[in-house]
Amino acid sequence: MQVLVGIVHVAAFFLGVFIVATTVMSAIKTFVLPRAANVRISRLVFVVVRVILDRIAPPSRAYADRDRVFAMQAPFSLIGLPGCWLLLIVVGFMLMYVGLGESPREAFITSGSSLLTLGFDKPPRFASISLSFIEAAIGLGLVALLISYLPTIYAAFSRRETPVAMLEALAGTPPSASSLLSRHHRIGGLERLDDLWITWRLWFADIEESHTSIAALIFFRSPDPDRSWITAAGCILDSASIYASCLDVPKSADCQLCIRGGYVALQRIADFFSYPYNRNPKPDDPISIDRSEFDDLWKELEEAGLPLRSDRDQAWRDFSGWRVNYDPVLLFLAGITAAPIAPWSSDRGWRYKPPPLLVTLGLRKPPQHPAT
């Protein structure tokens, strides 16, 4: 019997070590590691918060109501992350104290007292006292880590929102590709669009870096309820795709590089949620935009006096070939962020469906080629 008890204590101790080590690594990968990382705990927190808010404000509610609720998604997620980490730290050290011979009740009290630095419980053994010091240091470190990264988070948010706010003057509210191109044509600015493509290519590179290393930024909503970083991204990508495929203008390398930089950035952000999409789509794969919508856009551009190519059918094929690269991830990110309604992005009726738990925890790979 004593042998069995000893085995249980050893197993409990090493299970606690595993939980604590996993939790600490999760915190480091989430806030310190300067690259995208597959952090299961963080992804689970974001998905759970998203599901809860979706129950509070379902898609059937008015957008203004949903916007007020989802404005709290990022703050709740940021608060939920350290809360989840601290809970796991308590459980992990509790198991280690059990492994050192304390009863579960005593282990829980010791672990909670040490983590919160309350100091009302003194462990009976030197090994337990040493563990309590380590636990207190870890608890303070996790809280300090979150606080120290808040300025970094808000600096990245400010960089993201400046071009989004400026886009309203170019593309209207909600932003649309037809408005952006027509307005530039009226003021004689089509030949100066290369500057816009360069600006937004840099913007896409910035959000790829910031929104994959600090995933909470994905859910930070714009100060204006009618603006969204993802609908702005969709407007720019559609504008560049239409410019490259429909307008009778010289080819622009900056335009094409903007499209590629844009869809690569959105794909990297979608990867955080293990969203399945075809990484190598064919140009003729289906997209969420149908031919009649494209024809309506063509007529708008024609009435605005933009120089259009003579072959509309080929222009449609070229546009589809560009759009297919970012269509699924654009709709996914617009859905998961509950973005305001905007043409050809958040107006497609896409609804968020939480992935299976095993996929969320990274224990099973998602399918790679979903239907579009």
Please annotate each region the language model reported.
Residues 4, 58-77:
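Cytosolic juxtamembrane amphipathic/interface segments immediately preceding
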Residues 8-40:
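Transmembrane alpha-helix/interfacial motif
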Residues 9, 69-92, 101, 225-233:
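Transmembrane alpha-helical segments and their cytosolic interface motifs
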Residues 16-23, 78-162, 238:
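Pore domain of cation channels
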Residues 31-60, 159-175:
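Membrane-interface amphipathic/juxtamembrane segments adjacent to transmembrane helices
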Residues 41-56, 108-115, 119, 130, ...:
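Hydrophobic alpha-helical segments of integral membrane proteins
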Residues 162-233, 238-239, 248:
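Non-transmembrane accessory domains of multi-pass membrane transporters/channels
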Residues 196, 218-221, 225-372:
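Soluble C-terminal extramembrane regulatory/interaction domains of multi-pass membrane proteins
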